[in-house]
Amino acid sequence: VLSEADHTLGLTSEPEVLTSAGNPCAGVEVRIVDEDGKDVPVGEIGEVITRGDHVMRGYWGAAGQDSTVTKAVRDGWLHTGDLGRLDQHDRLFLVDRKGDMIISGGYNIYPREIEEVIAQVAGVHEVAVVGVKDQEWGQRVTALITLLPGAQVDSQQVMDHCKASMASYKKPKEVRIVESFPLNSTGKIAKKVIREQLEAE
């Protein structure tokens, strides 16, 4: 939760504070862990896990026998699947979804960061960045965009903007302009479907 003091701080001297989810509520524990479940240093990115009275004990019935769901709660800790970091004041910053992270050329790349940069290009409506299997890189950063009605944007404009705005290893290897995106049951862009479609080409 962001406190009144956090809002004041964010509006006067530290605007990044307002991009955080704030501090854990009373009775809620939050940790940032690596793949082995060990805490990462302050400021480093890892999976967000949480414990407290708000966390379920497990799943009822048949779902409780399914390892794909039971692995979410382990030893009382809910493994959220979100990637984030804690600052020195224990504020939580969410970075991306763990399943969306791209590993390319040995680098961990967070699609949301690239999507936010591409969204700055005038005329871009929606953006989806995914990692596509690649023999050379492991995964290839690929960006798909839809445009606002009447907008005239080409792939090279987007590539040039990325080149000027981010580290070289994060830049998309390919930018595609599409008419629409497949959506999941909650109305969000279905990145898994996009990834599968691209890899099937």
How should these model regions be labeled?
Residues 36, 52, 57-58, 76, ...:
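AMP-binding/adenylate-forming catalytic core of the ANL superfamily
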Residues 1-91, 98-101, 114-115, 150:
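Conserved AMP-binding/adenylate-forming
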Residues 198-201:
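A short, polar/charged loop-to-alpha-helix boundary motif
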Residues 175-178:
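General small-molecule cofactor/ligand-binding pocket signal
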